[in-house]
């Protein structure tokens, strides 16, 4: 057949390529997800009369029902078959499910015990912990500015530990557990929402068993006559899944560098919630420590 028509190169002066327009829906989904994560403390605070382990167990049970239902309606059971066909992935998701349940436990305990400010610090330092894991585990290389950023953040944490009387263990526990969780999920190479569904299914039996014991002992919070608490416990599962579904949608459609900036929406809103809405202290000492970490993030970013 005839040769395909090829347009001759145009001799017009070169114009620098414009960056592609940002996907509005993707951006909106990502921002909405981070805002939801940011106001989580206010939600869990409403359940502070319920023991933390019961809150986590309900969160797992209702999250499993919501996410599995969402996936089955959307695409059937293929996601589960795909994961089960790779045993290594199953073991990795077992490890990640234990880490995320620990992370949720520390976070809910912090919120219901007046430590939201400390919890927010955990998510400010999380990106820098990710950097260190990248260096130590994935053998990524840092430039001088990035090393300076990590050093300043470490000094900020040391300042908080020495002058605040005790190490910011809630912040460190949240940052480390979430960073290692992120690493395992990266290596497992499973999409965010199917991964959360499988993690929830792994944790489902222990969660149901714990709730069963609580009900049998007469200390179960669910169904004890307070319909508001019951509704909050049920919707906590959907609220766990919704931002992750939104984030999974958004992160695929916007530049990853933009995700890196947007991730600070959540801890900023958590800090504001803790100080202005829940009345927690934010001392000058803490301001200096947080300030060092914000400087580090600005240098790294």
Which ranges hold each PLM region?
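Hydrophobic alpha-helical transmembrane segments of multi-pass membrane transport proteins
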Residues: 35-39, 43, 94-111, 173-184, ...
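Helix-helix packing/entry segments at the starts of transmembrane helices
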Residues: 121-125, 192-202, 241-276
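Juxtamembrane helix-loop-helix junctions in multi-pass membrane proteins
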Residues: 36-63, 117-118, 180-205, 220
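Structural motif at transmembrane-helix junctions in multi-pass transporters
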Residues: 49-54, 105-122, 245-262, 281
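C-terminal-most transmembrane helix of multi-pass membrane proteins
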Residues: 16, 264-301
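Hydrophobic transmembrane alpha-helices of multi-pass small-molecule transport proteins
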Residues: 67, 145-161, 172-176, 285-301
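Membrane-interface interhelical linkers
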Residues: 3-32, 65-93, 144, 196, ...
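Glycine-/small-residue-enriched transmembrane alpha-helix faces in small-molecule transporters
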Residues: 9-54, 155-187, 209, 273
């Amino acid at each position: 057949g005839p040769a395909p028509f090829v347009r001759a190169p145009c001799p017009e002066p070169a114009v620098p390529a414009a960056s592609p327009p940002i996907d509005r829906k993707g951006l909106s989904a990502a921002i909405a997800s981070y805002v939801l994560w940011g106001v989580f403390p206010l939600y869990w605070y409403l359940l502070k009369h319920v023991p933390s382990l019961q809150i986590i167990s309900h969160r797992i049970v209702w999250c499993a029902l919501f996410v599995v239902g969402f996936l089955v309606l959307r695409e059937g059971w293929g996601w589960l078959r795909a994961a089960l066909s790779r045993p290594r992935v199953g073991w990795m998701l077992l490890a990640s499910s234990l880490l995320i349940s620990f992370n949720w436990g520390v976070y809910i305990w912090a919120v219901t015990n007046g430590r939201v400010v400390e919890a927010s610090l955990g998510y400010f330092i999380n990106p820098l912990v990710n950097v260190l894991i990248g260096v130590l585990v994935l053998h990524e290389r840092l430039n001088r500015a990035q090393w300076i950023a990590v050093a300043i953040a470490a000094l900020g944490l040391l300042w908080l530990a020495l002058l605040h009387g005790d190490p910011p263990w809630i912040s460190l526990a949240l940052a480390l557990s979430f960073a290692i969780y992120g690493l395992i999920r990266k290596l497992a190479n499973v999409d965010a929402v199917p991964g959360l569904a499988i993690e929830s299914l792994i944790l489902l039996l222990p969660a149901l068993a714990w709730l069963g014991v609580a009900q049998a002992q007469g200390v179960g919070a669910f169904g004890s006559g307070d319909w508001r608490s019951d509704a909050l416990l049920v919707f906590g599962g959907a609220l766990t899944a919704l931002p992750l579904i939104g984030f999974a949608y958004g992160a695929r459609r916007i530049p990853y560098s933009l995700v890196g900036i947007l991730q600070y929406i959540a801890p900023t809103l958590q800090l504001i919630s803790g100080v202005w809405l829940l009345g927690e202290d934010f001392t000058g000492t803490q301001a200096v420590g947080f300030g060092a970490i914000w400087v580090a993030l600005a240098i790294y970013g």
